[in-house]
Curated annotation (Swiss-Prot):
NCBIfam families assigned to the protein according to its UniProt record, in alphabetical order: aroE, PRK00258.1-4
A Gene Ontology molecular function term of the record: shikimate 3-dehydrogenase (NADP+) activity
Native organism: Brucella melitensis biotype 2 (strain ATCC 23457)
Membrane-crossing residue ranges in chain numbering: none
Protein name per Swiss-Prot or TrEMBL: Shikimate dehydrogenase (NADP(+))
Signal sequence coordinates: none
Pathway recorded for this protein: Metabolic intermediate biosynthesis; chorismate biosynthesis; chorismate from D-erythrose 4-phosphate and phosphoenolpyruvate: step 4/7
């Protein structure tokens, strides 16, 4: 039996609350059509108080697995009977699948972050030092990716220093916590600068200048933002003006979807320019560029 036959009729999902904003159905729908797989992928809105029962009834509802987004990632972590290494390190699950009747959880955000940089800025992981702006939940996946790829020194800057200290304590050696007032000084020797904050994101002061001067960064430094709405954030615009190589956050969204699709439908999809343009067209239609 070939992979297409095995995947026939398989169902997967993305769940969050709310979930109508998600572009995951567009991504997976594109791949299902491209690969000729007779499967489905749908958005399912689940309230926080209903998540545990939803996760427990995946098989009964005919699902092979699915993606989990805000606010359910920690609840999915707790619900999973088995966790992959990335999920354990990050403390959150964004991908669920069934294996011999057991609910398994993984986290593909770190993979997506690194794969996006591999595609758009090959050699990025030769940087000895990385600067991560922000210490929220998303920064954990970024830090895990950096450590996994051998970055020697990761500085995490956050307005509330205690949040950065918690993150540094979680990951241990090679991760260092700093207050926001130290960010400017840290730029000068950072080979990779990652923005995980909402500064410049739609509804968070878009159009405003990013409050850090990037002209003192090494000329070979790479700047990347995990935000993809808007596609060109204030941070990326400032980095581009400073002459740095920039990588937007859309690729992370696309690449993080790959491992889950392969688990549910049995074929590994490709992140192509055609897929990117498909999502960009939807973003333009929604006024999200």
């Amino acid at each position: 039996m070939d992979d297409k036959s095995m995947a026939r009729g398989r169902k997967a999902f993305v769940t969050g609350f709310p979930i109508r904003h998600s572009r995951s159905p567009l991504i997976h729908g594109f791949w299902l059509k491209e690969l000729g797989i007779d499967g489905s992928y749908e958005a399912v809105e689940v309230k926080p108080e209903d998540f545990s029962s939803f996760a427990a009834s995946l098989a009964a509802n005919g699902f092979a697995g699915g993606n989990v987004t805000i606010p359910h990632k920690e609840a999915a972590y707790a619900a999973a009977e088995s966790l992959d290494e990335a999920a354990r390190a990050i403390g959150a699950v964004n991908t669920l699948w069934l294996e011999n009747g057991r609910l398994c959880g993984g986290n593909t955000d770190a993979y997506g972050f690194a794969a996006n940089l591999d595609a758009s800025a090959p050699g990025w992981d030769k940087a000895d030092r990385a600067l991560v702006l922000g210490a929220g939940g998303a920064s954990r996946a970024v830090v895990h990716a950096l450590l996994s790829r051998g970055v020697c020194h990761v500085s995490v800057v956050n307005r509330t220093l205690s949040r950065a200290e918690e993150l540094a304590a979680h990951f241990g050696a090679r991760v260092y916590a700093h207050g926001w007032d130290e960010a400017q000084a840290l730029v000068s020797n950072a080979g990779l600068i990652v923005n995980t904050t909402a500064l410049g994101m739609s509804g968070h002061g878009e159009g405003q200048d990013f409050p850090i001067d990037l002209t003192c960064a090494p000329k070979e430094a790479v700047a990347t933002d995990i935000v993809y709405v808007p596609l060109r954030t204030a941070f990326l615009n400032k980095a581009e003006k400073a002459g740095l190589k920039t990588v937007d956050g859309l690729g992370m969204l696309l690449h993080q979807a790959v491992p889950g699709f392969e688990r549910w439908f049995g074929q590994r999809p490709q992140v192509t320019q055609a897929l990117r343009e498909h999502i960009l067209a939807d973003m333009a239609k929604a006024g999200a560029l």
